From Swiss-Prot:
Function noted in UniProt: Enables the recognition and targeting of unfolded and aggregated proteins to the ClpC protease or to other proteins involved in proteolysis.
PANTHER family, per database record: ADAPTER PROTEIN MECA, ADAPTER PROTEIN MECA 1
UniProt domain comment: The N-terminal domain probably binds unfolded/aggregated proteins; the C-terminal domain interacts with ClpC.
Pfam families: MecA
Entries under InterPro entries matching the protein: MecA_C_sf, Neg-reg_MecA
Name under which the protein is recorded: Adapter protein MecA
Record's subunit section: Homodimer.
Gene Ontology MF: a single term: protein-macromolecule adaptor activity
Family, similarity comment: Belongs to the MecA family.
Taxonomic lineage of the native organism: Bacteria, Bacillati, Bacillota, Bacilli, Lactobacillales
Domain of life according to the entry: Bacteria
Amino acid sequence: MEMEHINENTIRVLIGNEDLADRGITFLDLLGNHKDVENFFYSILEEVDVEDEFQGSEAVTFQVLPKNDGLELFISKNVAMDDLSSLEGLSEVNADVSELIRKQIEADKAAADELDEMEATDETNRNVIFELDNFEAMIQLSKEVFMQSVLTNLYTYNDRYYLQVLFLTDELEKTNVDNEIAQILEFAHKTTVTQDTLVEYGTCIMERSALELTRYYFND
């Protein structure tokens, strides 16, 4: 595991696959429960002996980028939307990092409003749950099916993967929804598992944009 300071507010940690294996964690795990993953991130801070630099910070953000031999972890403190220009120096590592951070911070701020919108429009929207044989099926689905006016959540439950698709039917014709469901069923199956069951007993590992996230992180 290697660490370097990008600037006074951001460090980059290179974590190899062997490092992840030693901790019993995979990249997919890092897309799961925020509280559990945060503990992992802070343990990394302790290991690279810079945790004191981040103590007392009002905001600490963790951004993960996959690599063939592991992942890059960017840890930033006190990053405000207006200060993201200071991250432009990351372009030599990955030209899209600063924009990715910006989008993820914006997504976090919009999450509560978006979930409220889902609940408020539930009666008019069409909510469908699909079961996937494995995560590889999810990857293939993300590569072949492109949809607009949908929200997608990916859950694990009883060692299976479930994709929840909320079709915003006020923006989609019923025929379009039926066609998109037919496309999804080429990679998934119908299921009797309900949203309530997944929320109560399952684990949401990708929220709101599961197809887009899978396509971004697992695009060969």
